[in-house]
């Protein structure tokens, strides 16, 4: 995943962000 705006929980973006990170 690509960090767009740090790690802001936003609907489906949350999964992405978390996938990425972990």
Curated annotation (Swiss-Prot):
GO terms for biological process: translation. One of its GO terms (molecular function) is structural constituent of ribosome. It holds the Pfam family Ribosomal_L32p. Keywords: Ribonucleoprotein, Ribosomal protein. InterPro entries: Ribosomal_bL32 (IPR002677), Ribosomal_zn-bd (IPR011332). The keyword Ribosomal protein applies. GO terms for cellular component: large ribosomal subunit. Belongs to the bacterial ribosomal protein bL32 family. This is Large ribosomal subunit protein bL32.
């Amino acid at each position: 995943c690509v960090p767009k705006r740090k790690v802001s929980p936003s609907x489906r973006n949350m999964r992405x962000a978390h996938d990425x990170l972990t």
